[in-house]
Amino acid sequence: MISKPDKNKIRQRRHLRVRGKISGTAERPRLSVYRSNKNIYAQLIDDVKGVTLASASTNDSEVSGKTKTEQASGVGALIAKRANEKNITEVVFDRGGYLYHGRVQALAEAARENGLKF
């Protein structure tokens, strides 16, 4: 029988392909997004030093919302707020191999509305 391809393995391959083309610096870090079934996570990463500068997720107490898309918008606003506290205004968006749709899009648009440029 033909087995169905594992969607997560395909996403990881796509993510590695994109990661070969983008990287973050201290002045313009990479905004990395990871989406699980229940939560969404965002990190600002300096790839030169290999350091996480700021992070936010739906597990943070500041994030609230009924739907997962509303929660993703809250994470986007929170990561933008934490970036502004560290004087970071420009980032490189890394969608993590996910389609720019739904929760990933909501996070990105909320981050843009709250002052991040990408």
Curated annotation (Swiss-Prot):
Gene Ontology terms for molecular function: 5S rRNA binding; structural constituent of ribosome
Keywords, alphabetical: Ribonucleoprotein, Ribosomal protein, RNA-binding, rRNA-binding
Gene Ontology terms: biological process: translation
Gene Ontology cellular component terms for the protein in this record: cytosolic large ribosomal subunit
InterPro entries given in the database record: Ribosomal_uL18_bac-type, Ribosomal_uL18_bac/euk
Pfam assignment, any one: Ribosomal_L18p
Protein family membership: Belongs to the universal ribosomal protein uL18 family.
Subunit field text: Part of the 50S ribosomal subunit; part of the 5S rRNA/L5/L18/L25 subcomplex. Contacts the 5S and 23S rRNAs.
Purpose: This is one of the proteins that bind and probably mediate the attachment of the 5S RNA into the large ribosomal subunit, where it forms part of the central protuberance.
Protein's name according to its UniProt entry: Large ribosomal subunit protein uL18
